[in-house]
Design a protein with these regions (language model features):
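Conserved glycine-rich
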Residues: 213-214
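Short conserved segments within the C-terminal catalytic ATPase subdomain
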Residues: 83, 108-120
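Short helix-loop "hinge" at the ATP-lid/N-box region of the Bergerat-fold HATPase_c
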Residues: 146-148
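Short alpha-helical segment of the dimerization/phosphotransfer core of two-component systems
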Residues: 62-67
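Acidic ATP/Mg2+-coordinating residue in the GHKL
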Residues: 174
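Conserved micro-motifs of the catalytic ATP-binding
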Residues: 82-87, 128-131
């Protein structure tokens, strides 16, 4: 009916306005944040400064990098939720793709705080996936970062890929404290949970999986730790 169509148009306009507003705020914040990061790096590396001052500058840089990641996650999850993020899918061999993404992470400073292993079954090595490579990289980065940031170093991280029941399965597990019960309840709830903990990075993981026609399952590792399993459709 005309009334229902008009209602849907209003909802679409509201969602678009929200996405545009978040994108605008994210853009405006990035410029001063880039300056803060740049100055902090300069001060951190300035040999003329006393060690305590350089250490504080390093702290400012680290916290600024966290803030930048949060802004990126907020912008991305908003676009994914409201269909404003175009997927640039390409056909990839899963084995080389996962190795490439893991190698990229190993080049980051956070990788020094973990013991990372990768295991891929022969079927997973040969599997074909139709994915947006940067988004899948973001998904894996968020999972690994979450394990490292919420556990004492060095945390042991294992990535395993396999083909199960006609789907590609990627599991990321750690030996840390595990997801708090409130976080698991919020992540696995079918509807948004009231007063849910702030888990933006993990929501991005969930949204990226859904955008690819897959799903992310968050749970507990054995005997302890966090475990997330990503299920993606195979491209045949």
């Amino acid at each position: 009916s005309a009334h229902l169509q008009r209602k849907n148009e209003i909802i679409a306009q509201r969602d678009n306005a929200r996405t545009q507003w978040i994108a605008g705020v994210s853009h405006d914040v990035r410029t001063p944040l880039a300056l803060i990061l740049g100055w902090a790096e300069q001060l951190e590396q300035d040999k003329a400064l006393p060690a305590p001052a350089r250490q504080k500058a390093g702290g400012i840089r680290t916290q600024s990098e966290k803030l930048r990641a949060l802004i990126d996650d907020l912008n991305l999850t908003s676009k994914l939720q409201y269909g404003a993020q175009p997927l640039r899918k390409e056909l990839c061999a899963a084995g080389p793709l996962v190795r490439e993404l893991v190698a990229q992470f190993c080049d980051s400073p956070l990788a020094e705080r973990c013991d990372l292993s990768l295991t891929q079954t022969p079927a997973a090595e040969q599997a074909k996936l139709s994915v947006d490579r940067p988004l899948l990289g973001r998904l894996l980065e968020n999972l690994l970062n979450n394990s490292i940031r919420h556990n004492e170093a060095p945390v042991r991280l294992g990535i395993r890929t396999e083909v199960v029941g006609g789907s590609f399965c990627l599991t990321v597990a750690d030996d840390g404290a595990g997801y708090p019960p409130a976080v698991l309840a919020a992540l696995n709830a079918p509807e948004p949970v009231e007063n849910a903990p702030h888990i933006l990075g993990l929501h991005v993981v969930d949204n990226i999986a859904s955008a690819h026609g897959g799903r992310a399952v968050f749970g507990k590792n054995t005997p302890h730790g966090a475990k997330t399993t990503l299920w993606l459709p195979l491209d045949t």
